[in-house]
């Protein structure tokens, strides 16, 4: 599945290089028009990252996201700055289909597990941003990549499998925003090890060949941001490569 994505800072469409707020590119685009274009080209799921909220949860762009959800028919997955159950339930109440939870799953796993039990495993996607060290360990970063986490991807998957983990978004931080291609070995490894999880691949997608490579790796979906914004290819072309299931 092709999952077009936009990142938002104070209502503007942006891209960060490797999660660094100091390496930001701003695009002179309307978030709604951009997402409508992706919807019209056949996207079955859209992905929005609230980067303002990720940095400061008090400044989450909930009203903007609510207006986008109202105007679009396609299901929307939203991440960025969700730290409390109230914030999670607010997003679900305004019509967001699935909420992405990142750092909190590492920092407060028991709390996040309770949300899986209460809201169901379809309502939550874990975002696992990994740094692969020299030993090949997949260490999950926390706090918008601004500090290390210490837990491995495998240990987190084991922990959340007990509450029915179904959706996980995995980014190899070293590839994000680089257009250097996805880490297909990573996706092949985890989709083989945990076939029950719908893995969303993210980071580094530059060409349709990259899209095809991720599809072949066994991932269930691919999040594409920058490549679409700079017209490397279209959503329509990507779906031709990887038809929606």
Swiss-Prot record:
Disulfide bonds: none annotated. One of its GO terms (cellular component) is cytoplasm. Keywords: Amino-acid biosynthesis, Cytoplasm, Histidine biosynthesis, Isomerase. Pathway: Amino-acid biosynthesis; L-histidine biosynthesis; L-histidine from 5-phospho-alpha-D-ribose 1-diphosphate: step 4/9. GO terms for biological process: L-histidine biosynthetic process; L-tryptophan biosynthetic process. It catalyses: 1-(5-phospho-beta-D-ribosyl)-5-[(5-phospho-beta-D-ribosylamino)methylideneamino]imidazole-4-carboxamide = 5-[(5-phospho-1-deoxy-D-ribulos-1-ylimino)methylamino]-1-(5-phospho-beta-D-ribosyl)imidazole-4-carboxamide. It holds the Pfam family His_biosynth. InterPro entries: Aldolase_TIM (IPR013785), His_biosynth (IPR006062), HisA_bact_arch (IPR006063), Isoase_HisA-like (IPR044524), Isoase_HisA-like_bact (IPR023016), RibuloseP-bd_barrel (IPR011060). One of its GO terms (molecular function) is 1-(5-phosphoribosyl)-5-[(5-phosphoribosylamino)methylideneamino]imidazole-4-carboxamide isomerase activity. SUPFAM superfamilies: Ribulose-phoshate binding barrel (SSF51366). Its main location: cytoplasm. It is found in: Cytoplasm. The active site is at 7 (proton acceptor), 129 (proton donor). Its EC number is 5.3.1.16. Belongs to the HisA/HisF family. This is 1-(5-phosphoribosyl)-5-[(5-phosphoribosylamino)methylideneamino] imidazole-4-carboxamide isomerase. It comes from Shewanella piezotolerans (strain WP3 / JCM 13877).
């Amino acid at each position: 599945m092709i999952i077009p994505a936009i990142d938002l800072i104070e209502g503007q469409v942006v891209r960060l290089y490797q999660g660094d707020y100091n390496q930001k590119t701003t695009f002179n685009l309307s978030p709604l028009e951009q997402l409508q274009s992706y919807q019209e080209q056949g996207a079955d799921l859209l992905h929005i990252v609230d980067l303002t909220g990720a940095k400061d949860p008090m400044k989450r762009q909930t009203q903007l996201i609510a207006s986008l959800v109202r105007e679009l028919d396609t299901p929307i997955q939203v991440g960025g700055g969700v730290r409390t159950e109230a914030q999670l339930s607010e997003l679900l109440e305004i019509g967001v289909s699935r909420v992405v939870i990142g750092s909190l799953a590492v920092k407060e796993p028991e709390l996040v597990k309770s949300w899986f039990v209460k809201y169901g495993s379809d309502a939550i996607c874990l975002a696992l941003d990994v740094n692969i060290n020299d030993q090949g360990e997949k260490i999950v970063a926390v706090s918008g990549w601004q500090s290390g986490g210490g837990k491995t991807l495998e240990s987190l998957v084991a922990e959340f499998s007990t509450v029915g983990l179904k959706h996980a978004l995995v980014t190899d931080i070293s590839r994000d925003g680089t257009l250097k291609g996805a880490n297909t070995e990573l996706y092949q490894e985890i989709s083989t090890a945990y076939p029950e999880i719908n893995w969303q691949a993210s980071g580094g997608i530059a060409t349709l060949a990259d899209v095809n490579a991720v599809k072949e790796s066994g991932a269930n979906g691919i999040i594409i941001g920058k490549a679409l914004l700079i017209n490397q290819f279209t959503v329509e072309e990507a779906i031709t490569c990887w038809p929606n299931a």
